[in-house]
Amino acid sequence: MELHSRGRHDAPSLSSLSERERRARRARRFCLDYEPVPRKFRRERSPTSPSTRNGAAASEHHLAEDTVGAASHHHRPCVPARRPRYSKDDDTEGDPDHYPPPLPPSSRHALGGTGGHIIMGTAGFRGGHRASSSFKRRVAASASVPLNPHYGKSYDNDDGEPHHHGGDSTHLRRRVPSCPTTFGSSHPSSANNHHGSSAGPQQQQMLALIDDELDAMDEDELQQLSRLIEKKKRARLQRGAASSGTSPSSTSPVYDLQRYTAESLRLAPYPADLKVPTAFPQDHQPRGRILLSHDELMHTDYLLHIRQQFDWLEEPLLRKLVVEKIFAVYNAPNLHTLLAIIDETLSYMKYHHLHGLPVNPHDPYLETVGGMRQLLFNKLNNLDLGCILDHQDGWGDHCSTLKRLVKKPGQMSAWLRDDVCDLQKRPPETFSQPMHRAMAYVCSFSRVAVSLRRRALQVTGTPQFFDQFDTNNAMGTYRCGAVSDLILGALQCHECQNEMCELRIQRALAPYRFMIAYCPFDEQSLLDLTVFAGTTTTTASNHATAGGQQRGGDQIHPTDEQYANMESRTDPATLTAYDKKDREGSHRHPSPMIAAAPPAQPPSQPQQHYSEGELEEDEDSDDASSQDLVRATDRHGDTVVYKTTAVPPSPPAPLAGVRSHRGELNLMTPSPSHGGSPPQVPHKQPIIPVQSANGNHSTTATQQQQPPPPPPPPPVPQEDDSVVMRCQTPDYEDMLCYSDDMDD
């Protein structure tokens, strides 16, 4: 200001100057304004804010003298003036030189479409930024709108003392560096003064605003905000684990946990008194505590060790483990065991959802969760649900709701959809009945697992997470052991006067008893005697003799030679209908078959004996033939004989009987007299009578001694023993609907 006042008193009038001199004077006035020191002593300093022309000249003059004194002590070289950078709140990064600070909305409207860039100065003029800054401050003062809080004060000296503008707080105030060599950073004392004076109140104001916003929200909005915060936390943890962990191998699957460690997930080691985590829980392993709380499961690395073992297993071994898990779940002995298995599976899935772990679609827990809701409903259906849920006899509305939670939703028509899908998508906490809430948890977890496995099969190169499919936030609200607590609590709190209802509850919670009075079998079917391979001939003969003495009728005596030839092969073309059915049920195993002994009957009633020759005919002929055989036995009173395969062809015996077309051990009876002689098979052996019908005498036919037959060829691997074949584990997809009819 002193320079301009001196120029106005001593300089000639503008009318006496030429046009060139007037332009130069005008440029000098805009560029060298507020510079009271000579050019050679001038140094870069903080620009002062324009004050009123009538009262601030003296104070600025004294301030300039202090600045000149400080410059003379430092002896800093003269450098071209630059546009200062405007630091942010964190004082770590300044704005670029060509971006001025933003203006308030009212100032932008006042300036028009150009905004804050209406005056940028001249590139060749030093201090051009000061003119634009002063103009912006005047615009901000006229708008009476406070700007961003980090433009709170301007520091006009090197000591960082704030300069106030006549008590007017609406002026635009900015912070500029005190040294030209440190653009983008401020003096430490200035930073401390700034944060201590303006950041505290602003932070308090911000917290007050947030508190008011939270008070204005309803329950749904608060719940959505909580979900968003949890999602942000999981994303931050995943980024931290990805940055700190090792990169996975190129050959490892996308769901591999190589980059996830207990340290990156912030998990504590599991307690030492727990049972060792293993993928194959067996009873012979060292015992330990298996009751774990919610915090022990969710915030330790116990489940992480189990999941890592699943990833390390080879695919065949993992599939066998899946089958073992399926049979353990589907054969749960009581309701207590099934609830423990369900909570184990749901807690395992909750662990993945909480820590944002990628899911292995071939996990044993993920393979079995799909059928748990139907299994749980089957166990609960043994109870008196009408009395427990509706307090009445028979099913009511609550029972129907429980069944609709379990059933598969279907589309009724193209325009009308079944409301079962909407019911199953409801959040579990919206159900008031404890059993409904427990079933809703199981149903929601099952739907999430099925959707994830379907998506994983479609998109193989992308890891899948549970939070992508948890639409009703069932995994977020589930706590470990919630299903058992809800159902067992409902059964414990139920009170009624119905004794049968109480008995059903007791039987459902206790292990089932093995109650069987007898084990029936069909004497017309063919039994597989390979299970009695260790039985000797003498023992079998003794049992047959004892049975014959008790019956007082016909008895059967198998011989040593008959048991020696049990392994003979038969022609598949000569199999009967009963034989083919039995072969299909036992994987076409050509095991030796023998007709079962008839049950005990009174002596007055004749016994019916069936041979394999009779089984080859149709049902009508079988019935007629059996009746004729009974009558023939009554009339003639002949013996019941066996036929062996070790005897070569020979002339038939006087007693002709119906012979089988097979070379196995058969039960024979005489042919009826009125039916004529049956067709004889020339390559069969004679009939050997064992004992007469009346038991007074027995006739023994001479049998030609022949060398033993050659040993049968070894069976092919596909025709192994039926018991061994049944022990082989099928694939998982085939096992779910496994039956004997599908063995072909």
Swiss-Prot record:
KW Glycosyltransferase (keyword) present: no
Record has Transcription regulation as a keyword: yes
Subcellular location: Virion tegument; Virion; Host nucleus; Host cytoplasm
One Pfam family here: Herpes_UL69
Keywords assigned: G1/S host cell cycle checkpoint dysregulation by virus, Host cytoplasm, Host nucleus, Host-virus interaction, Metal-binding, Methylation, Modulation of host cell cycle by virus, Phosphoprotein, Transcription, Transcription regulation, Virion, Virion tegument, Zinc, Zinc-finger
Region (Disordered): 1-202, 580-724
Binding positions (Zn(2+)): 387, 494, 496, 501
Residue stretches of biased makeup (Basic residues): 72-85
Biased composition, class Basic and acidic residues, residue ranges: 1-11, 153-171
Recorded GO CC terms: host cell cytoplasm; host cell nucleus; viral tegument
GO biological process: regulation of DNA-templated transcription; symbiont-mediated perturbation of host cell cycle G1/S transition checkpoint
InterPro entries with a match to the protein in the record: ICP27-like (IPR008648)
Biased composition (Polar residues): 179-202, 691-702
Start and end residues, zinc fingers (CHC2-type): 387-501
Modification(s) after translation: Phosphorylated by UL97 and host CDK1, CDK7 and CD9. Phosphorylation by CDKs impacts on UL69 nuclear localization and activity.
Top-rank taxon, per record: Viruses
Annotated Acidic residues bias: 613-625
MF GO annotations: zinc ion binding
Ranges of biased composition (kind: Pro residues): 706-717
Quaternary state and interactors: Self-associates and forms a tetramer. Interacts with host DDX39A and DDX39B; these interactions are required for UL69 function in mRNA export. Interacts with host SUPT6H. Interacts with host EIF4A1 and PABPC1. Interacts with host PRMT6.
Physiological role: Immediate early (EI) protein that plays many roles during productive infection including regulation of host cell cycle progression, regulation of viral gene expression or nuclear export of intronless viral RNAs. Acts as a transcriptional transactivator via interaction with the cellular transcription elongation factor SUPT6H. In addition, acts as a post-transcriptional transactivator that mediates the nuclear export of unspliced mRNAs via interaction with DDX39B, a component of the cellular mRNA export machinery.
Family under the similarity heading: Belongs to the HHV-1 ICP27 protein family.
Protein name: mRNA export factor ICP27 homolog
Organism: Human cytomegalovirus (strain AD169) (HHV-5)
